[in-house]
Amino acid sequence: MTENEMTSNDSTEPTPTTETAASSPDPSGDPLIEQSIDVEGTDSTAAETGKPVIESSDLNVFYGETQALQSIDLAIPEKQVTAMIGPSGCGKSTFLRCINRMNDLIDAARVEGDLHFEGKNVYDADVDPVALRRRIGMVFQHPNPFPKSIYDNVAYGLRIQDQTENIDEKVETALKRAALWDEVKDQLDKSALDLSGGQQQRLCIARAIAVDPDVILMDEPASALDPIATSKIEDLIEELAEEFTVVIVTHNMQQAARISDKTAVFLTGGELVEFDDTDKIFENPESQRVEDYITGKFG
């Protein structure tokens, strides 16, 4: 859960300047949680039946008079990595930001259609976006650690949500999950700004997972990193999918092929052209347009 600047490579898509994911101390009062969504029960059912955890139906998004997404029908499975690829301005980051309602921060944005998380339409009037963002964390393109210590960065969301019992253990667990603990365990009081870019991004991932969300959204999480740091992030994403549903936007098709289970291909005009198992998308796509894009004939 972050509150810093959000950026995107999709130059035609407006981006919110801040994430207002502040939390109330008592999550029991949040409308989303009051919908009686049983996380454990839902997870079990989804795992047994393959029911999607996120599902859009005829989803359309506009920025003023410009349509960014056109009638998107997409079902994202639980505890897998789903990649979204496509040329700049195709709407993939717009879709990502719809999932936890980050587009609410753009005045000109308008959303039509349905987008369900665990069976509940996230755009229903009784859904609190702040409560939604507690369960759907986000990691941005550029690392954005707070100007605080490494420890305080990870503890930030826990303190806001009044989850301070055993906080040291929770911070350690999050850092271990993010494959950062061994590198920072003896310098938790060090400023997060002194970390390398790759370490900062893993710290942001630790901060996001510390509050134990159900879904992690990632918008180009490795685009600003060197190849070694990128490899660590990719390995981490595959590990995170054992516990979380991961949705990643990437311009790097090789990255999508390496780490994702499912791939959605968006093309110019905000159209979802194909969604399937990643191997099938890259080896035998149904759409000629998708094949042309993947082979570099356009886009």
Swiss-Prot record:
Lipid bilayer topology: Peripheral membrane protein
The entry lists its GO molecular-function terms as:
ATP binding; ATP hydrolysis activity; ATPase-coupled phosphate ion transmembrane transporter activity
Enzyme Commission (EC) number: 7.3.2.1
Q: Which GO terms describe its cellular component?
A: plasma membrane
The record's subcellular locations are:
Cell membrane
Would you identify the family this protein belongs to, as annotated? Answer: Belongs to the ABC transporter superfamily. Phosphate importer (TC 3.A.1.7) family.
Subunit structure, per the record? Answer: The complex is composed of two ATP-binding proteins (PstB), two transmembrane proteins (PstC and PstA) and a solute-binding protein (PstS).
Which NCBIfam families is this protein grouped with? 3a0107s01c2 (TIGR00972)
Report the function annotation for this chain. Answer: Part of the ABC transporter complex PstSACB involved in phosphate import. Responsible for energy coupling to the transport system.
- The protein's name: Phosphate import ATP-binding protein PstB 1
The species is Haloarcula marismortui (strain ATCC 43049 / DSM 3752 / JCM 8966 / VKM B-1809) (Halobacterium marismortui)
Lineage of source species:
Archaea, Methanobacteriati, Methanobacteriota, Stenosarchaea group, Halobacteria
